């Protein structure tokens, strides 16, 4: 539980959670109230932390190498490539990082050429469809999912 809370704090401090949440919500964002949006952002940030913590469970004692970094002028984003090595092979991870208010924030994580943000948008769009793109109704489902994921993670 303490490890998860540390992961959650790190993600909340270093990921552009609000911006990612808004992008992932898609068209349901515009029809929601301010309170619903704030609740959704908090639920999304917890979902993201749970998702990353769950992925990290399978990793320990891996070695990694920073392979490359480059600045994409068009999108004003820095891309940092790293390779993570394990007994079964290696995996390529690209961090998309953007500067905002004199700080750098992770805006996406691309693992084996698959964007976390694009994947989440697709996943959430399917779930939002089931609530007719009503963000308030979706928040209830997301809270239930977060609670279930949290219990699985700490048990």
Map each language-model feature to its residues.
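Early exported N-terminus immediately downstream of N-terminal targeting peptides
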Residues: 1-52
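Short leucine-rich amphipathic alpha-helices used at interfaces
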Residues: 1-2, 6-9, 13-15, 20-21, ...
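Juxtamembrane/interface motifs at transmembrane-helix termini
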Residues: 26, 57-63, 126-128
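Surface-exposed aromatic
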Residues: 37, 80, 106
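A mature extracytoplasmic/lumenal domain signature
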Residues: 44, 70, 83-86, 97-99, ...
């Amino acid at each position: 539980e303490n490890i998860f809370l540390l992961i959650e704090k790190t993600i909340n401090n270093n990921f552009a959670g609000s911006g990612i949440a808004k992008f992932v919500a898609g068209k349901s964002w515009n029809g929601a109230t301010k309170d619903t949006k704030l609740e959704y952002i908090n639920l999304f940030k917890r979902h993201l932390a749970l998702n990353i913590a769950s992925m990290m469970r399978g990793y320990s004692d891996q070695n990694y190498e920073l392979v490359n970094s480059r600045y994409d002028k068009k999108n004003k984003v820095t891309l940092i490539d790293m390779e993570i090595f394990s007994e079964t092979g290696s995996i390529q991870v690209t961090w998309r990082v953007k500067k905002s208010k004199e700080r750098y924030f992770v805006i996406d994580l691309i693992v084996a050429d698959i964007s976390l943000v694009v994947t989440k948008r697709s996943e959430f769009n399917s779930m939002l469809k089931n609530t007719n793109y009503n963000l308030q109704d979706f928040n209830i489902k997301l809270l239930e999912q977060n609670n279930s994921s949290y219990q699985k993670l700490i048990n």
